[in-house]
Amino acid sequence: MPEYIKRKFGDQTIVFETGKLAKFADGSVTVSYGETAVLVTAVSVTELKEDQDFLPLQVEYREKAAAAGRFPGGYFRKEGRPTDKEILTSRMIDRPLRPLFPKGYFYETQILGTLLSADGQNDPDVMAINGASAALMVSDIPFYGPVGAVRIGQIDGRWIINPTHREREISDIDLVYVGSEHYPLMIEGSAREFPEEEFVKALEFAHQHVQEVIAAQKELAEKVGKPKRSCVLFEENLAITNRLAELYSSQLQDALYTSSKTERQKKLAKLKEELTAKILEEFPTATPREITSSYDSLQKTIFRTNVLETKRRCDGRGPEDIRPIAIETSVVPRSHGSSLFCRGETQALCMATLASLNEAQELDAYGGGEQSKRFLLHYFFPPFSVGEVGRITGQSRREIGHGALAERSLLPVIPSETDFPYAIRVSSEILESNGSTSMATVCGGSLALMDAGVPLKTSVAGISVGLVKGKEEDFDWSRYCLLTDILGLEDHYGDMDFKIAGTRKGITGFQLDLKLRGIPLDVMAKAIFQSQKARMVILDCMDKVINAPRAEISKHAPRIEKIKIHPDKIGLLIGPGGKTIKKISAESGAEITIEDDGTVMIYSSSADSLEAAREMIEDMVGEVTVGGIYRSKVVSVKDFGCFIEIKGKGEGLVHISELSDTPVRRVDQVVRVGEEIWVKCIGVDEKGRYKFSRKAAMKELHAKRMQ
């Protein structure tokens, strides 16, 4: 029997419905908001795999073209590999749910979200998160939920709950907040240099407005929820852990507090071999899973105890210390802009590339939102960056997620298309990794863009703040320590990875990941202000190397020539099936874009190529404009000058004084009838006739060739 719960959520109503669709799943809920609807199912197996030592949670979100009344793109006209949007939404669903499964619950679990209907106004990602929580709540799968998700915006100082795509375009912040009844669990988003004080207010506002969604899920679970299943939870073998502590605590302490990551890993690997052999002598029936679990548990205990009691970290730093920073720019000769950003043992090589607007990425956004992107950032994490051998395939979900975080952190300072009509791409190659590579990408990306001459509004830097909590109890926050600029090991054994990027004025990008069942807002606020302090230090380091964009773009980057044609002539320039414009591009070697208002942009790194393309376009559809330069033919010579003809555009006069920089006594000594010359339109006389200058055209063309 279908059951549903309705709640007012922002300006609209959110509806949770279960018992109608996908009834064979352990839990199934359809969430509707406006005319956007997402079906989310949860299934968990009842058979535990032997030696399974982690929670194999798989979260997949998919958007169907039919939901928006469209055909899929591509040759086969069907949905294929997940898009970046689908992957990012899957990650947003996964991250707040993972800490809420019982400790030791290692049963294979799958959560699937499917977009059923898209109204093009409301982003389905928030509904998918709420649906996943609700599906687990009505199922028999053990789960310490529910959680509620909301998107928050701010327009003209006014908070907006679940802003539409159009509202998000003008909002000062785009915050996705996921929280429990008591604490935040996950946040993600971007902002336009948002002040830290206002950011904390946004979190408080969001926390208030997830409570209705949480209450709705509780009510639905009370109506139709199944009793939670009994299951076997993996428990650490305390006898082995205690014995390891007796025998190896001192050696583990020394190994963990080795400043070099490589040396630390070697010591820990050697120690594990030794202690495994020793434990098997004393505990012959111990499984590899039990030994590894106890070994990791002891490392974690030693690490956390040291941080809490001595405030000393593995590399000798204090809680708020930043690792040494080294920066270089212009490190790749043929790149349009590049930088090498090193923070401790984390190293990011970032390269910026400029191209025509034709290279902007077209998106199949079935759920609405932007349909194209002219600024792209791609993040690559090769296995050698951590000293490993691995498969080289397409980008992983993690790489896509890290790239998206860095991209939205830099986007608020990217110049508008009007001010800088280029498509822009930053690629980040992580060459060494020991924590916080996404924030290194933000710093390196900002430096590379400035090196490329992109007129950024200001520099952007990022830092990650970690956390070690004293007690496991959810509500006991009497003892904790926040760590600035965390290492990979601190991320692994710590409780939080809070990435925040921004400028000197405020925050531009953020992402919170927790291993706990939430964190108090006041602790989050301390982390936010701690990151602000660190960001200023990093920006100072960056500004010492490059504090403003280069005055000129790279000689290898395409230059731009801008022409205005009458909109009625756009079709003539494009030609049937794009034949004409493609021919001009092929013959000139330039890339050409055409806007609906008749603006034609010509891109080429060669001045000759630019001139050739401009000449061909002008010959075909151009109109004479003051300041324009044209190839013309001399049709008659007079004592006072010469008359020229511009193909398809009529005639005009070049006065004798405009023929050359040097005095001219006889016109026929400079030009002859039938000769082709370059002229610049310098005005219109009182009768509406164009006046041209040969010397002005030659001077301007010479200056362009010298660039």
UniProtKB/Swiss-Prot annotation:
InterPro entries: ExoRNase_PH_dom1 (IPR001247), ExoRNase_PH_dom2 (IPR015847), ExoRNase_PH_dom2_sf (IPR036345), KH_dom (IPR004087), KH_dom_type_1 (IPR004088), KH_dom_type_1_sf (IPR036612), NA-bd_OB-fold (IPR012340), PNPase (IPR012162)
PROSITE patterns named in the record: KH_TYPE_1, S1
Record Pfam families: KH_1, PNPase, RNase_PH, RNase_PH_C, S1
A GO molecular-function annotation: magnesium ion binding
Reactions catalysed, as given in the entry: RNA(n+1) + phosphate = RNA(n) + a ribonucleoside 5'-diphosphate
Coiled-coil regions listed in the entry: none
GO biological process, any: mRNA catabolic process
Membrane-spanning ranges: none
This protein's GO CC annotations: cytosol
Chief location category: cytoplasm
Location relative to the cell: Cytoplasm
Known function: Involved in mRNA degradation. Catalyzes the phosphorolysis of single-stranded polyribonucleotides processively in the 3'- to 5'-direction.
Family: Belongs to the polyribonucleotide nucleotidyltransferase family.
Name recorded for this polypeptide: Polyribonucleotide nucleotidyltransferase
Organism: Methylacidiphilum infernorum (isolate V4) (Methylokorus infernorum (strain V4))
Lineage summary: Bacteria, Pseudomonadati, Verrucomicrobiota, Methylacidiphilae, Methylacidiphilales
Record gene name: pnp
